[in-house]
Amino acid sequence: MTTETEKRALEDDTVESKRIKYDKGIAPIKPEFIVENPSVPADDRYVNDDDAEAGDRNGEEKGKKKKRGQNKKRDMRQQHEEVRLCSSLLDPSNPGTCRFGPEHCRSTHDVTTYLAAKAPDIDGVCPVFKSIGYCPAGLKCRWLNSHYEDGKLKRDQSQIDAYASSGQGEVNKISTEAKLALQKKKYLFEVSDNVIKYLDSQVQSDENIAKREEAKENNASYVEAPFKIAEKKKLDLRGAKIVSPLTTVGNLPYRRLMKTLGADVTYSEMALSLPLLQATNSEWALPKAHSSEYPGFGVQIATSKHWAAAKAAEVIYKETTHVSELNLNCGCPIDLLYRQGQGSALMEQPARLLRILKGMNASSGDIPVTVKIRTGTKDNKNTAKSLVERVLAENDVAAITLHGRSRQQRYTKDADWEYIKEVGAVVTEWNNKKEEDKESSETNRTNFVGNGDVFTHEDWYNAVNTEGVDSVMVARGALIKPWIFEEVEAQQYLDKSATERLDILRKFADFSLEHWGSDEYGVGLSRRFMCEFLSFTHRYIPVGILERLPPKINQRPPQWRGRNELETLLGSTDYKDWIKITEMFYGKTGDNFTFIPKHKSNAYESG
């Protein structure tokens, strides 16, 4: 006969056996979706946000080669067609002029030979032709049969007119004249030249002041700036849905996609000031934006010199038309930039940072200047608070963004939102003083934006409701889950089906072909950037297979299977599956396609 005590013990054992134990840092996936004896080690399956911030600018560390870790020296080149057609013959019915002449041109002028050697067309209608009514790639298009008939390229005039009237297209393209002037060092920097002279004198003055001890002498050495800063456009980021500047993955098609998914503010990939001033084509491709991004598009630059910052600010102001803010990167943690005194290294040189901001502010016309920083450069030594106090006192910045991690910490720990709150209080106090001061009350308030670990609508609202925080900048969360701002708007979790997620990728594919082109080279480039995108999106775990909410961005899952084959495919960590997904939009990979991801555990070379 079982006693009452024994019954209770049996009940306790039953409850204990049903209770699921969760390991810290492991995503709580329902048991029926967990794969037993996984083929892929958990260690190799996850990357961190450095990949988004560093992109392809990271430096290779000296020492022994490792089989794991980042592929920092990645070859990004994509091969062209074996038989190339001269660009003057893209439209044979309306040929252009070849500057080399048919006899000296390295590309063929024989259309028949080119078409015979060209790879088979991809099935379906050309996404670019469907969108804008014609295809700029002409005969080189991989979907040529959809808009080529009887030896002529088709044009849908009604679609061309509709696209033109919509005002869509890419903006912020530098003119050929300006580019040549920069390359020949004949560009007129009418504003920044005067600003630089003043800042140079301030550097000398600072060195002299450091040698003096009496405050009166210091005050006497102050020289009024010989220029007036232009009135800036108003920048109000309160409650704005902001996508962080992201290198490589933060390209134009991705940002355009995010605008369709609810983003209010986007930023260019980080551009280096010196290559901008040298008119490097690859660098000037970065400030380009889609018209849908403006207003709300910011250009981010990195620099270590005040003269380069001032000149870059002036040329961006003069040569672009759709820029809402100019952002200085003082948060990038990668070694290459840090060793050059750029990115987060500026936090260790406050005087230099302040000069750079002054130069940008004075040279950027009506474009407001903003800055992105970290808590500091070293663990357990936060310096952002004192730095922000100096920035507010000595510069009129429109916004300060604080990433709640140090450079040294990277992503080993959660973002420090308590410290973000502390710094936010400093900015709030400053704004309140400005409102009370009649002389400065007419100047725009300084926005304060937090950044770090926002992955759900709950994270977003918790952050925005933090005292002193105007809005939140989302980085990894917007890469892993591009519809995060739809969740913010709905204030609930959205369990997107695999088909819906595939539609998001399809939209990215269409945007990428419009941007990079539908020829062989453009398709290869688009495929590569979709693979980069998938290196983040595959990390999303559908909320419908989780035991409990909320999901955390730093949680690592055991290997899992989806609710259908497509969901499993979209969550695959295998690079071969990423390639398979791209083939749904860009056709089969050719022998000339290569993809080397950031992590050495995944690499692909066709053939």
From Swiss-Prot:
Cofactor list = FMN
Gene Ontology, cellular component aspect:
cytoplasm; nuclear periphery
Alphabetic keyword roster: Cytoplasm, Flavoprotein, FMN, Metal-binding, mRNA processing, NAD, NADP, Nucleus, Oxidoreductase, Repeat, tRNA processing, Zinc, Zinc-finger
GO annotation terms (biological process): mRNA processing
Q: Where is the active site?
A: C332
Record-listed E.C. numbers: 1.3.1.89, 1.3.1.-
An example molecular function term from Gene Ontology annotations:
mRNA dihydrouridine synthase activity
| Amino-acid positions noted as binding FMN in the UniProt annotation, renumbered to this chain | P245, L246, T247, Q300, K372, H403, N451, G452, D453, A475, R476
Where would you find this protein in the cell?
Cytoplasm; Nucleus
Q: Where are the zinc fingers (C3H1-type)?
A: 81-112, 125-150
Q: What class of enzyme is it?
A: oxidoreductase
Which intervals carry biased composition (Basic and acidic residues)?
42-63, 72-84
Catalytic activity reads: 5,6-dihydrouridine(47) in tRNA + NAD(+) = uridine(47) in tRNA + NADH + H(+); 5,6-dihydrouridine(47) in tRNA + NADP(+) = uridine(47) in tRNA + NADPH + H(+); a 5,6-dihydrouridine in mRNA + NAD(+) = a uridine in mRNA + NADH + H(+); a 5,6-dihydrouridine in mRNA + NADP(+) = a uridine in mRNA + NADPH + H(+)
By its UniProt entry, which Gene3D superfamilies does this protein fall under?
Aldolase class I (3.20.20.70)
Write down the CDD domains for this protein, in alphabetical order: DUS_like_FMN
Query: Residue ranges of region Disordered?
Result: 27-88
Major subcellular location class: cytoplasm
- InterPro entries, sorted: Aldolase_TIM, DUS-like_FMN-bd, tRNA_hU_synthase_CS, Znf_CCCH
On the tree of life, the source organism's domain of life is: Eukaryota
Say what the protein does: Catalyzes the synthesis of dihydrouridine, a modified base found in the D-loop of most tRNAs. Specifically modifies U47 in cytoplasmic tRNAs. Catalyzes the synthesis of dihydrouridine in some mRNAs, thereby affecting their translation.
In terms of PANTHER family, this protein maps to:
TRNA-DIHYDROURIDINE(47) SYNTHASE [NAD(P)(+)]-LIKE (PTHR45846:SF1)
Q: Could you say which protein family the record assigns here?
A: Belongs to the Dus family. Dus3 subfamily.
**What is the protein's given name?**
tRNA-dihydrouridine(47) synthase [NAD(P)(+)]
The uppermost taxa in this organism's lineage are: Eukaryota, Fungi, Dikarya, Ascomycota, Saccharomycotina
What gene does the UniProt entry assign to this protein?
Answer: DUS3
